[in-house]
């Protein structure tokens, strides 16, 4: 269900690469890829190296490491960063039909979490990057989205998502909330 459009959009394999909503630099595939679902028939996975990445700290509910300057509607403001130990993987498209020829992901060695993503167009040029921060609940290990920054290097546009998590309702969540029929009927 997309509240801003007031409708449910059923995503199929052909439109998973479309923007989730108009004027966003975010496609369903980018959102879904953060769940780290893989398909070895469609993609080749190669560990490139081990190293470090400068990424937003995972600080739980202490504060938001992204503090954009709202007056300028741009990638300005303050972003706290820290060096994180990572494995770097390349995910190469084998179908020649995926929107990206390659994704390079930095997976945190301690948190097992994707810290940074670079996405390359069909010509091999850097197209988009992904950096995010989550709300972490240390006592349970649960996490929810907090902030996502997705710059489009080619068009010089970006999307910033700021999400307010509601921990009070976590215990009320179950798989029925994600059933397509229930989402379609939810008003």
Regions picked out by a protein language model, each given a short descriptive name:
Residues 42-77:
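Active-site environment of non-heme Fe oxygenases that use a 2-His-1-carboxylate facial triad
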Residues 177-186:
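Short, low-complexity, Pro/Ser/Thr/Gly-rich segments in the mature regions of secreted, periplasmic
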Residues 1-37, 71-178:
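Gly/Pro-enriched, hydrophobic low-complexity segments
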